Amino acid sequence: MEDVQNSPAKVAMSIDRVGVRDLTLPLVVRDRESGSQSTMAKVALSVDLPAHFKGTHMSRFVEALEDWSEELDYQSFYNLLSDILRRLEAERAHAELSFPYCLQKKSPVSGRKGIMSYECTVEGEMVGDNLEFTLGVKVPVMTVCPCSKAISDEGAHSQRAVVHIRTKSKGFVWIEDLVEIAEASGSCEVFSLLKREDEKHVTEKSFSNPTFVEDVVRNAAMGLEKHSKILWYQVDVESFESIHNHCAFASIAKPK
């Protein structure tokens, strides 16, 4: 049969990335407490395309993913991208997996357990034999405005914020490590289950530890600086301001 994809392109221009996205894949990831956990990932796969080819072979991405059934780590990601490079005869391959990661978390006073879900992303780009691997997680925290507290006779405005951490490392890093760094950066952690005594604790703790969005991003960056395995990071914090019709944000990236 005619291979239309390998025919000459009418416009001889190279393409940085071409591929497939929104594939759904059962995934096993490493869990610090129980060893591993099963989740579902949304997957995007792509390669570069030289100027002289009309198109890429989309089915080969799906074939590579179907043949990949390893637990997610650096080596298994390396194997997936190596296979994509080979199948599509490309120079550069990229993969992104987004998935929920669940942790059972105790309420601070009652000790009642509730499931917290964190949005995680693993990205990889391979050129030749070199793989650049990035792990990311989004973690909700609570913030109380220091200015509002300082100028008010009673109370202060508080809100939820999201700390988005992305890292490159020398060796394996637990997702839990990043979650703990993020949760320690705000006025207080967020919990899925709170009884009255827990709610009292969270309220009092957060109001005794007011933080601007600037404080949160700096605290998270400092925690990442202290981690022995993290080589590079980017932290983005977005605060969903309760008294404004806009959000506040701050970002710090370690130079590469």
Curated annotation (Swiss-Prot):
Keywords attached to this entry: Hydrolase
GO MF annotation: an example: GTP cyclohydrolase I activity
Positions bearing the site annotation: May be catalytically important: C145
Species per Swiss-Prot/TrEMBL record: Maridesulfovibrio salexigens (strain ATCC 14822 / DSM 2638 / NCIMB 8403 / VKM B-1763) (Desulfovibrio salexigens)
Leader peptide range in chain numbering: none
InterPro entries in alphabetical order: GTP_cyclohydrolase_FolE2 (IPR022838), GTP_cyclohydrolase_FolE2/MptA (IPR003801)
Protein name according to UniProt: GTP cyclohydrolase FolE2
Catalytic activity: GTP + H2O = 7,8-dihydroneopterin 3'-triphosphate + formate + H(+)
